[in-house]
Amino acid sequence: MKITKITTYRLPPRWMFLKIETDEGVVGWGEPVIEGRARTVEAAVHELSDYLIGQDPSRINDLWQVMYRAGFYRGGPILMSAIAGIDQALWDIKGKVLNAPVWQLMGGLVRDKIKAYSWVGGDRPADVIDGIKTLREIGFDTFKLNGCEELGLIDNSRAVDAAVNTVAQIREAFGNQIEFGLDFHGRVSAPMAKVLIKELEPYRPLFIEEPVLAEQAEYYPKLAAQTHIPLAAGERMFSRFDFKRVLEAGGISILQPDLSHAGGITECYKIAGMAEAYDVTLAPHCPLGPIALAACLHIDFVSYNAVLQEQSMGIHYNKGAELLDFVKNKEDFSMAGGFFKPLTKPGLGVEIDEAKVIEFSKNAPDWRNPLWRHEDNSVAEW
């Protein structure tokens, strides 16, 4: 079997799919994207295709190493996202050829279900509370929400009080009937993170995500030393070499590699094993589409330390398409009591509605994240 063609499709709301075709008619799908840089990743995918056309798709490990090492410059969000989507598609092909789900090819299940959590948007406490009530009606009891709006490098007590007030009202409304993580989204400087984490401790959030930017990772152990709240990070780390430094430094309790940013299934399985060796849990980052989610689920079901799975159903970014709009076998992604079950169809287990993908790709938006500014008109972290 040989790879004959690679096609990319930019899609709403902010996704990109790729299709790898073979001379035997077996097709694999992947999801390579950096949100806000889809065209750049698309160019990288097509550059990498020169290494892939005419090659045997079953040699996933060798093709991965070629894509990573054949170029003198390596790593980073663009290259690793391009590799990630290609890697997903290669695993999809292998599973279809062998008539087995990817998790079966990786040694089989370590669990029968995985807890999912849902994003809850809204700037006002009442909006967040209403959103949680709605999601509880369909079985969710675990959530994630923004921990704060933009904060200055040194901000005032009013900004801190506003963030804490939202969390306090949520805990008061639901008590211990729900769990929620707080995403600082890298918006908070190290000095302000110390203040905010201390103030939030009485409300027992499940975790705090990206308490500071990944490039300030030297603060993770310092922040962890002052709190009992687990710290989470990983969506802006792109290879096992990035994660190695964080694991060695300590401080992170929940690792969040993104299967569409950090080299795909091949790389993230290695990252999961590294995390387990440090007694660090795994909760793959996934505010993206169905192929990315499927890849995450296969890792979840073969990784002992996986504890939570993010998913984008109803997320506020999903303008123009919802999580399963391009999927034919929607029922395979159904949840019971807030848990996903293993996908059982061969490969990634996603049946893509290709006609719909082609149609929607004709008018795909160029999504960009908002540009925020502080009161003094300096650029704020989004």
Swiss-Prot record:
It comes from the Bacteria. One of its GO terms (molecular function) is magnesium ion binding. Binds 1 Mg(2+) ion per subunit. Keywords: Lyase, Magnesium, Metal-binding. Pathway: Carbohydrate acid metabolism; D-galactonate degradation; D-glyceraldehyde 3-phosphate and pyruvate from D-galactonate: step 1/3. GO terms for biological process: amino acid catabolic process; D-galactonate catabolic process. Belongs to the mandelate racemase/muconate lactonizing enzyme family. GalD subfamily. Catalyzes the dehydration of D-galactonate to 2-keto-3-deoxy-D-galactonate. Reaction proceeds via an anti dehydration. This is D-galactonate dehydratase. It comes from Escherichia coli (strain UTI89 / UPEC).
